[in-house]
Amino acid sequence: MTNKPTPTFYIFHGEDSLTRGEAVKKLREAMGGDSNADLNISEFDGQVASPAEIINAVTSYPFLSDKRLVIVKDLLAWLTRKGAGAVGKKGIEHLLEVLPTLPDYSRLVLIERETLSDKDKLVQLAESSPNGYSKGFTAPKDATGWIQKRAQAEYNIQIDNRAAAALAEVTGDDLQRADNELVKLFNYVAGERPITEADVAALTPYVPEANIFAMIDALATGRGQQALQLLHRLM
């Protein structure tokens, strides 16, 4: 049994910009760390560059390297938008024809901010072609659970249920913002103890009711400075 070859084109789609961005970062890192790597990485705005221009870039032979990486944002959404007409249809047809034939050194990454349908022709092509790869990055249904898992896996720190729920209430499905807040909270507690709801209230713009609760808790446990910070947030 032969292994599937390394993909030459990828479709990363979905609302989870954080995890999607991490997947793109891994492909960047795979280009190597020498000075030639940046010479073989190009980025395009799919609303500006044409499919022909993008294909020309990704099929250009790499300079002193064995790979060329081209990253394109929102191309498919642009080609299939309302009003794209014959130009959009022609662009999709061009991609369907050319993507399976990309040379082995090509690494084309199509990034879409919205989740694509399983019936999308290019998604189906990426999933069925030996040289294609498609992955959806949907926002988790349980943001509180995601925050707790992220804190443990990425920062080796615990965040209690109420703190995670409070943070999830503030950040919603914006996982990038949630992760940024986790970094702040990790530094705030110096990685020495679990993150509490009072910590979230002290550092994060938060619902007033929770700030009041956290302030009372801080006063009751002798944390006067933290209680004062929370009082200023309420004023």
Task: Please provide the spans of the model-predicted regions.
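Conserved beta/loop motifs at nucleotide-recognition and modification sites
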Residues: 1-235
